[in-house]
Amino acid sequence: MARTKQTARKSTGGKAPRKQLATKAARKSAPTTGGVKKPHRYRPGTVALREIRKYQKSTELLIRKLPFQRLVREIAQDFKTDLRFQSHAVLALQEAAEAYLVGLFEDTNLCAIHAKRVTIMPKDIQLARRIRGERA
């Protein structure tokens, strides 16, 4: 872009310049807290985006194994008592459950974005399941 000569313009009002002398003096005379540093905080959303990138790169299971195993055994009790599970069977169930949940949350996020929101809500999950045909 070509440079143009700046010409002086007459001010038409606006904000008056702030007086900083009093605030600077008050800041200098204020007692320090003995070098106690505030803990560092990231801006809202920064950590969330970092976690999204981290978990999208990873392939490990996100639900802890033992709590998931207890849940499977608790649900299986309703169908038949004294059932035994091979460890690979529980792992296969966990892989399938996590894959289902990740896909559901992806669809849920799309529903929230479609509604011009960034926060997912229960109604987004219900809509995603309804569109998938899982719930009438």
UniProtKB/Swiss-Prot annotation:
Query: Where is it expressed, tissue-wise?
Result: Ubiquitous.
According to UniProt, the name of this protein is Histone H3.3
Write out the PTM section of this UniProt entry: Can be acetylated to form H3K9ac, H3K14ac, H3K18ac and H3K23ac. H3K9ac could compete with H3K9me and prevent gene silencing. H3K9acK14ac molecules are 30-fold less abundant than H3K9ac or H3K14ac. Very low level of H3K9meK14ac. H3K14 is specifically acetylated by HAG1 and deacetylated by HDA6. H3K9ac is deacetylated by HDT1. H3K9ac is restricted to euchromatin. H3K18ac, but not H3K9ac, is cell-cycle dependent and linked to replication. Reduced H4R3me2s increases H3K14ac in the FLC chromatin and activates or maintains its transcription. Mono-, di- or trimethylated to form mainly H3K4me1/2/3, H3K9me1/2/3 and H3K36me1/2/3. Very low monomethylation at H3K18me1 or H3K23me1. H3K4me1/2/3, H3K9me3, H3K27me3 and H3K36me1/2/3 are typical marks for euchromatin, whereas heterochromatic chromocenters are enriched in H3K9me1/2 and H3K27me1/2. H3K27me3 is largely restricted to the transcribed regions of single genes and not associated with low-nucleosome density regions. SUVR1 to SUVR5, ASHH1 to ASHH3 and ASHR1 to ASHR3 methylate H3, with ASHH2 methylating specifically H3K4 and H3K36.
Protein's UniProt keywords contain Transcription regulation: no
Locate the site labelled Not N6-methylated.
Answer: 15
Q: Which organism is it from?
A: Arabidopsis thaliana
Annotated positions for site Impaired recognition by ATXR5 and ATXR6: 32
Q: What does this protein do?
A: Variant histone H3 which replaces conventional H3 in a wide range of nucleosomes in active genes. Constitutes the predominant form of histone H3 in non-dividing cells and is incorporated into chromatin independently of DNA synthesis. Deposited at sites of nucleosomal displacement throughout transcribed genes, suggesting that it represents an epigenetic imprint of transcriptionally active chromatin. Nucleosomes wrap and compact DNA into chromatin, limiting DNA accessibility to the cellular machineries which require DNA as a template.
Q: In the record, which positions carry Phosphoserine? A: 11, 29
- TM annotation in the entry: none
The GO terms describing molecular function are: DNA binding; protein heterodimerization activity; structural constituent of chromatin
N6-methyllysine is found on 5, 10, 19, 24, 28, 37
What broad class describes the main subcellular location of this protein?
nucleus
Annotated compartments: Nucleus; Chromosome; Nucleus, Nucleolus
Give the organism's phylogenetic lineage.
Eukaryota, Viridiplantae, Streptophyta, Embryophyta, Tracheophyta
Provide the positions where the record notes the PTM Phosphothreonine.
12
How this chain assembles, per its entry, is:
The nucleosome is a histone octamer containing two molecules each of H2A, H2B, H3 and H4 assembled in one H3-H4 heterotetramer and two H2A-H2B heterodimers. The octamer wraps approximately 147 bp of DNA. The H3K9meK27me dimethylated N-terminal tail of histone H3 can directly interact with the chromodomains of CMT3 and/or LHP1. Interacts with AHL27. Binds to HIRA.
- Residues with N6,N6,N6-trimethyllysine modification: 5, 10, 28, 37
Q: One Gene Ontology cellular component annotation?
A: nucleosome
- Modification type N6,N6-dimethyllysine: residues: 5, 10, 28, 37
Check the record and name the InterPro entries matching this protein. Histone-fold (IPR009072), Histone_H2A/H2B/H3 (IPR007125), Histone_H3/CENP-A (IPR000164)
Where are residues bearing N6-acetyllysine located in the sequence?
Answer: 10, 15, 19, 24
- Region labeled Disordered — which residues? 1-43
